[in-house]
Amino acid sequence: MEYKRFKTRQIKVGNVLIGGDAPISVQSMLFTKTRDIEGSLEQINRLYFAGANIVRLACLDMADARALKEIKAKSPLPLIVDIHFNHNLAVYCAEFIDGVRINPGNIGSKENIKEVIKACKECNIPIRIGVNHGSIEKQFSDKFGYGVDAMLESAMYNIKLLEDLDFFDIKISMKTSDAQKTIEAYERLRPLCDYPFHLGVTEAGTKFHSTVKSSIALGNLLLKGIGDTMRVSMTGELEEEIRVARAILQDSGVQKSGVNIISCPTCGRIQSDLLSAIKIVEEKTKHIKEPLNISVMGCVVNALGEAKGADVAIAFGKNQGLVIRHGEVVAKLKESELVDRFLAEVEDEVKSRVVKE
């Protein structure tokens, strides 16, 4: 299957390019109160080290807005302010923030949106039209209900509103809490405009449910060439949002980065403590940003075949096993020594690639 990404306009959020030929960026949103400057910066730094590209923050009132100005001055990542109901907060924040997300369903009148556009245009920052199936404008929900038809009408109405005011630094999201409807919404909007898309499933739930829903919806869209930036929404799991998003990009084959771990599900042939080994390997390799395929297999049935396609591999046997690199056996050791040697080979593989670059 040939991957061909839909060519969109390119915009800029801080120092991050979105759309065009730019890599697909990964976003998250803080769950602190924005007025908690120290707590917000702590979460931003966690996301930075987890591999996030952009962070969004809620802004409920002027206390949040003033705090956001100080947070922005100290943040290692571009910041987007998330505005609902009070358009004046977007106008105030525009001069020091990297982007604004508005919800057309609750930002208020056309005049309110015009004021936000004027501020963003003067400050040269983009706007995300964040259409959400749970908060569609009344004029569209009355006619179409709260389904995909209403979302499309809302998106196109607001795109035209911004364009009529000569504003084109736009990205769009079409979020629902249902994977199938999310796919439909983005697919139907894609031929109608060339603005970059922010992908996501809203209110996706806790780690398990969010991972399943997001993998289905975002993976499906990415494989069809749709999507320029993305967030895996997950209740209370900052680093996991980034980890799952990067895994979706990696395992869909759309954007390679980090470690791809191949490991067997275990069966009655296992004669080693594979579960402990894989947990150690996962923990010790999660910091790696280089695209790397590693294999941890519990017996010889598939181990050697998988090892041929892996950069570094372990093939466990009874009380012993093999460490394999690029299909060649580099060590035969007793079980207690295998994981340490394997991890050493992984680190050496990463270093060798850095040197080549």
From Swiss-Prot:
Keywords: 4Fe-4S, Iron, Iron-sulfur, Isoprene biosynthesis, Metal-binding, Oxidoreductase. It comes from the Bacteria. The keyword Isomerase does not apply. Its EC number is 1.17.7.3. The keyword DNA-binding does not apply. Pfam families: GcpE. Its cofactor is [4Fe-4S] cluster. Pathway: Isoprenoid biosynthesis; isopentenyl diphosphate biosynthesis via DXP pathway; isopentenyl diphosphate from 1-deoxy-D-xylulose 5-phosphate: step 5/6. It is an enzyme of class 1 (oxidoreductase). [4Fe-4S] cluster binds at C264, C267, C299, E306. One of its GO terms (biological process) is isopentenyl diphosphate biosynthetic process, methylerythritol 4-phosphate pathway. One of its GO terms (molecular function) is 4 iron, 4 sulfur cluster binding. PANTHER family: 4-HYDROXY-3-METHYLBUT-2-EN-1-YL DIPHOSPHATE SYNTHASE, 4-HYDROXY-3-METHYLBUT-2-EN-1-YL DIPHOSPHATE SYNTHASE (FERREDOXIN), CHLOROPLASTIC. HAMAP family: IspG. NCBIfam families: ispG_gcpE, PRK00366.1. Belongs to the IspG family. Converts 2C-methyl-D-erythritol 2,4-cyclodiphosphate (ME-2,4cPP) into 1-hydroxy-2-methyl-2-(E)-butenyl 4-diphosphate. This is 4-hydroxy-3-methylbut-2-en-1-yl diphosphate synthase (flavodoxin). The lineage of its organism: Bacteria, Pseudomonadati, Campylobacterota, Epsilonproteobacteria, Campylobacterales.
